[in-house]
Amino acid sequence: MCGLAGIINLAAPRSQECTFHILKGMADAISYRGPDDEQYHIDSKVGFAFRRLSILDLVNGQQPFLNEDGSIVVMVNGEIYNYKELKASLHNHMFKTTSDCEVIVHLYEEKGIGFVDDIIGMFSIAIWDKNKNKVFLVRDRFGIKPLFYTELKHELIFASEIKSLFSHPHCPRQFNWKEALSDIWLSGEAASNHKETTSFFVNIQNLDAGHYLEINLTTNERKTASYWSLQDILLRQGYRENLHPDDLIEGYRELLADSVHRCLQSDVEVGLFLSGGIDSAAVAHFAAEKQDLHTFTVLSQSTFTNEDAKYAHWLAKDLHLPNHQVLYQLGNDELLQPESYKHLLWICETPFCGPEQLYKFHLHKYAKAIRPNLKVMLTGQGSDEFNGGYSTTLSPAENPSWEGFIESVNTMEMNRLHRLQGNIFRVWEEHFGLSPINLSYLKSNDSSQADPWQSYVLTKYRDLQMYNCWHEDRIAAANHIENRVPFLDHRLVEWVCGIPDGLRKDLLWDKSVLRKSLTNELHTSYTHRPKVPFFYGKDVRYTHKMMFHLLKKNNYQLIEEAFSHSDASSIIQVEHIHAIMTYLEDDPEFTNFEFLLRLVNMGLLSKMTKETPSVQLDITSHLESITIKDWHSQEGDIASRLNISANKCEGQDILALNPGVTLLRPESDSEHCIYIAEEGFIQFIVSEEDVGAWLHILCDINGKDTLHTILDRHGVSLEEVAKYIQEAIEHNIILIKQKNLPEGAYR
């Protein structure tokens, strides 16, 4: 994990002193990416700045690297996992360090830009070849390491982060509202997306994964080229047609184990984010084969109720690894300060910022505070995208199968093609509720020609670059930590993408290839555990409630700052934002809150872009963790610390309305709803359309009958209404009376 910045003069060069002054500002803007060292290389045409986080060869690994005669200058942000093999293949070269990245300068000498085909790793690279008078900017195959650039009047500048570019006096600083508001994922549209990646800032380019930019300083010609194409890999999908499924599974296991082991190479401490799911469990298992490492888990209301935290505790115990359960409490001011959220948003530099980033930022911060020598963190990112992790989520409830998943993917692809053609055919679908136009006809004007699965994978590939890798890099870097992702070893991804069409159903439904590869490695309680979202799912309301209260803080400070300036006020109707907030406050589920937060993020970024605030790391304050020795015996205490009601309703319990609550029925029976009043004021509306049978159960609560009795009267199971009962308890609408307690004694 390091920070790059550079200036390439395309016309008459400025003085080296002036270049250094500008480069210094660009490097300082991302100093947290490299707190251990700061180096510069400047000549008449090119200036490089490097901020180093030292992980291998702590003493001598300064960059930029030069070849023997100084004609080639290289900066590398990332890790070259096969550097030892590459180094052994390079003869007659003088290596000055034992850093993994120094191998690049000599590999380029031998092979030119084709060197990149030999690398296993994650990287963004800048090469200044004085002999050819060319500069190359190179990015790894999945965009794990960031690299942005912009062309100015007489120069091209590049950096690891956008905020570094903004430090250049001539760089445009303007948020791209049109790009953000029309982004398919930001708006939540259910469509495939194969568009090039974007930065969401005007004239700032995001160098796509698997690409390099070549700048010829003799002709000033610039060209971008692909050296690795996921689409080409997918189009070769039959090249493992002759392999037996067992061989595909075993090959996958071997590659994953090798990738995890390579990701452990370090001269400093390595840690692991342990979620309780199959992905981080796999990484933890293979990592534990080689070394002991501390694991870190989010312990929140959501991860408690979806049992992620519990399974993480159990797995760490089984693997004999220390596990830190980091406590996220709803009312914790450390989490919920507008200024700290703006700090996080500026770290991320994208509207895709929310609770996931908040949780992970503080998890990194905690890890750094209690383990100061920890500089590397392993995560399970990238498994879902290529192993079929979202297949169960995307398949419809009425058809939870691979076929149902493909049906949903087809719909997403149809929506993408409609978009490409300006929605000119969508009116036919609107007439009938389904499209009479053949998907193959829509595809006839689309150059990608991908089948549904391929289209889906290409969409997730873009998502990785725009969301997963982007955030994991920024949040780790802001805490002086490098994030490593074993599932994004290109050999592993190519292996999965080579699974023949006929075997996808068996190996890519619910990540079967991963689960089956661990059959002899982990207990079935881990390998067969269903996928649960990090904080989404049935208890996402806890997280949305936390973020909602953040927006309300200090009299709606974040909303006022986001939309009061001229750029935002001309685009967003602020009064409607406040109306949405009022609506959400009355919605126990805080439905679609994340889309409101993204709009607020856009407004804040638009404002902060003009201010370019600095990013500083402060680990003097951090969240606390809970020491858990036995989950079952401590479960009640854990729930109490999380402010989760211990009053889980059971069938033998007797329910009663809170004495201050009144249920009001509308005059017309056709409305099928009731109004819930507290102390004479209507607070909630409960509609049968929204909650189904719960409406009738609520009306039948009388303080005398057990819940089982009421449920039996209506032919309803406890599972159908348990969520609504818990919500009603949390909002003090109903109380629980246990049998054999005195009259009026409730809990």
UniProtKB/Swiss-Prot annotation:
Pathway: Amino-acid biosynthesis; L-asparagine biosynthesis; L-asparagine from L-aspartate (L-Gln route): step 1/1. InterPro entries: Asn_synth_AEB, Asn_synthase, ASN_synthetase/amidase, AsnB_N, GATase_2_dom, Ntn_hydrolases_N, Rossmann-like_a/b/a_fold. The gene is asnH. Residues 2-218 form the Glutamine amidotransferase type-2 domain. It comes from Bacillus subtilis (strain 168). The active site is at C2. SUPFAM superfamilies: Adenine nucleotide alpha hydrolases-like, N-terminal nucleophile aminohydrolases (Ntn hydrolases). Belongs to the asparagine synthetase family. Keywords: Amino-acid biosynthesis, Asparagine biosynthesis, ATP-binding, Glutamine amidotransferase, Ligase, Nucleotide-binding. Its EC number is 6.3.5.4. This is Asparagine synthetase [glutamine-hydrolyzing] 2. Gene3D superfamilies: Glutamine Phosphoribosylpyrophosphate, subunit 1, domain 1 (3.60.20.10), HUPs (3.40.50.620). One of its GO terms (biological process) is L-asparagine biosynthetic process. One of its GO terms (molecular function) is ATP binding. ATP binds at S395, P396. It is an enzyme of class 6 (ligase). It comes from the Bacteria. It catalyses: L-aspartate + L-glutamine + ATP + H2O = L-asparagine + L-glutamate + AMP + diphosphate + H(+). L-glutamine binds at R52, L53, S54, I55, L56, N77, G78, E79, D100. Coiled coil: none annotated.
